[in-house]
């Protein structure tokens, strides 16, 4: 059995079912210990020609054999089958339910964690929590309760019967048990550490494989297959070594338990045989005594298995608890209200921001205003802080009080859900789900109609590409959309955002993978379809945003200029230098980009 704040609640939640299982287990254990008495009757009846039943000496006849031995044995077997089926359903059914509920808690908590958590913790490590560690918890919960009560109850009842038959023989048999208990306690601590190392090694291996499969195109392009194979072999070797180390400890424990069992059998046969020779035991009683010991062999073995499972369970529970205890850094404050009827007004007011693990401010005293319905371009060099503005607007990170307002309300005074719901977002990394194109476009809108999906695809200039596919909108994309081109992937992401028709549309460098003609079509469609709604378009190229209502030019985290393209070109030297440089690059490159 394992205990911890992440799992203790389930013992209470499933208490009625677990108590029924324990009651069934106790019943099975009790009637199981009636079998050695039947052994004694058979042996003594065969040797002496008579048996003692309930204090009466009876001749060993067919009637006595059937009535007092065979018939009781049939009932014992029937009751044991029913009881074992019942406790299996109770214990293992509860364990499955616990794993399912714990998995849901983990997923619910994971989705509320900030972006910072996922930058530190890799996908492979997280996935191992949902697979290996949860499976271990499920196994420990069901088997752990079974082994604990079975070992305790069956072991105690069998020992009581053995003690009543001969206390000296029982004391001799218990000496190896005491040694085994001490060794098991010490070894359980070692096994817990070894299991934690094993799980971490598996997580590292899983994460490495996941990254390689996701980036297989890059690996092939740079001809690094052999290098990655060598790195995988190294991690696989480390995983093998920690698995072997754990297996050695587990095997040693199993060998010690087997040695204990065999040594006790030697004691029973030696001393018990001597008692039979002296006439203090008859052959039937010795067989009965051995039958009781056989009944506690399973509890003895269960102790070994319980130590191993508990060690693994503690390690896995610690890893899962770390996830469940991970702080939710970005969360609603008490008493926040929803952002009602948003119009798309945005104001940054003297905002300075540094990422939680950052060493310097990525935004410095940023101030500018976007009126509802304006189309605004945000431009600057790579690393200037453009994406940081989006991160804060979407409340991906915590925003300093009094520095960011939506429709005149401090974003910290309104719910995160309502702020994000007022926005449609196309990130730099255009993520697509491994699902149909229709599902990907309609992801942001519940029950989106096919007509709406088709219209959004047309606005993103991707409809013609989609209908050319064999299955059209029902084409299933590969993982992360790898079955479509970069430009198609980008335009499907734009269609998904346009379908939401949110008051605020944010496109973060979202037309970089399309040609100039397609870019112009998309921008023209945005202008007509987004009339009266706020649009933020982050871009590296000035030509992408020069026709927008105004442009915010950012340099080294500071807003250097805000205004229409022509005004910035006249008044801002750095902006003018960037425009001229990009024009020169276009002329040298034939005027194309993407």
Go through the PLM ranges and name each one.
Residues 12-13, 115-116, 132-141, 145, ...:
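An intracellular "coupling" helix at the cytosolic face of ABC transporter transmembrane type-1 domains
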Residues 1-35, 47-72, 86-91, 95, ...:
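Membrane-integrated ABC transporters
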Residues 13, 17-29, 76, 143-197, ...:
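Transmembrane helices of ABC transporter permease
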Residues 339-594:
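ABC-type nucleotide-binding domain
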Residues 106, 110, 219, 320, ...:
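Helix-loop junctions and hydrophobic alpha-helical segments within the transmembrane domains
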Residues 161-175, 245, 249-318, 324:
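Helix-loop-helix
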Residues 110, 232, 320, 348-350:
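Conserved catalytic Walker-motif region of ABC-type ATPase nucleotide-binding domains
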Residues 2-3, 91-92, 111-156:
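Juxtamembrane loop-to-helix connectors within ABC transporter transmembrane domains
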